[in-house]
């Protein structure tokens, strides 16, 4: 079992004060022992990752950029989740809410499509997508349980439908690999 899981929430393209509360809520929702840190110092997204045709960022390129800038953190085992104040895509998809690059130890969540509705709804959606990408960084695949945070979301309505929690099956996989918070 891995002894310490550390996540750093990184604002990309906006001031990150909202991430402090998000880090606390993510730690509370994570079924395994983990430390969640939040940077309030934003990283600018790489302009070379921006598609002017699509008006979106290439999520793979953004992940690679974060990895190169914060390599020393990743080398120490810290998993980075960039929260990008923009829209993102990967080839073959019109958009993505997030992308985990497990080999890099980096994931990103894209906020543009999560911002419809009130601020409370946005914060809840953001929490769900951060937990979803954290699950991928910890080795979880998509889950067929539509209420599980690891369920794949094709629309913001599907994000709203799932809970900000791991289902019993996904939770068991994490606890088996990383131990439970009660240990």
From Swiss-Prot:
Extent of the signal sequence: none
Record carries keyword Zinc: yes
Residues bound to Zn(2+) 1: 132, 136, 142
GO molecular function: metallopeptidase activity; zinc ion binding
Pfam families: Peptidase_M54 (PF07998)
Enzyme class: hydrolase
Location of the active site: 133
Cofactor, free-text remark: Binds 2 Zn(2+) ions per subunit. One is catalytic, whereas the other seems to have a structural role.
EC number: 3.4.-.-
GO terms of biological process kind: proteolysis
Keyword terms, alphabetized: Hydrolase, Metal-binding, Metalloprotease, Protease, Zinc
Superkingdom: Archaea
InterPro entries: MetalloPept_cat_dom_sf (IPR024079), Pept_M54_archaemetzincn (IPR012962), Pept_M54_archaemetzncn_arc/bac (IPR012091)
Assigned protein family: Belongs to the peptidase M54 family.
UniProt protein name: Archaemetzincin
Organism: Aeropyrum pernix (strain ATCC 700893 / DSM 11879 / JCM 9820 / NBRC 100138 / K1)
